[in-house]
Design a protein with these regions (language model features):
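C-terminal catalytic "cap/lid" subdomain
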Residues: 1-180
């Protein structure tokens, strides 16, 4: 099987970024918020990631980026995953979360939506079906699908042996599959 290689994104510039500038945020009052050492991604070392993948390794990235001076910056895990998948043209991206997928009712795991198109995901956000932390997760995923380089994004929860393979082989088998 595949062999994982743990890296943090700032290692050898695997993930490049810039410090997020202060800005006014919804619900944060009128003054700009300084995000500290939070960064926004500007690029990846696709050659290094490709080399690792080509050698049968699976890069496991801790969500840090490095700016031009080498300063480590914290970046959102979903953003890193979606942008790496897009940069590499991944056929599938699996996001593991605390719920078994996108739920119609966050209190009812049986309300899992098995598949969603981008249009359906946007509608579910707009009509309030999707709430909380699932909104930015879907928004980032929609962005990754928009360029056409990622085939499908699978959002899954607690998975057992063989579940990831089942989800990839049958979209929505154990989670929610988001497709263009």
């Amino acid at each position: 099987g595949a062999r994982p290689v743990g890296l943090h994104g700032a290692s050898s510039g695997v993930v490049a970024g810039v410090k997020r500038p202060p800005r006014v945020v919804s619900g944060g009052g009128p003054d700009p918020i300084d995000f500290g050492l939070v960064g926004d991604i500007t690029g990846f070392d696709e050659a290094l990631l490709g080399l690792l993948l080509g050698a049968g390794h699976v890069p496991v990235l801790a969500c840090l980026a490095a700016d031009a001076s080498g300063q480590a910056l914290n970046v959102n895990a979903d953003i890193v995953a979606n942008q790496v998948a897009s940069a590499l043209g991944a056929a599938h991206l699996v996001l593991v979360t605390s719920t078994p997928g996108v739920l119609r009712d966050v209190k009812d795991p049986a309300s899992r939506l098995r598949t969603l198109t981008v249009a359906q995901a946007k509608a579910a956000i707009a009509d309030g079906t999707v709430t909380g932390g699932m909104i930015p997760k879907l928004e980032e995923s929609i962005g990754a699908l928009a360029d056409g380089r990622v085939g499908a994004i699978h959002i899954v929860g607690d998975v057992g042996v063989g579940d990831l393979v089942r989800e990839i082989e049958t979209a929505g088998a154990v989670g929610t599959a988001l497709m263009a």
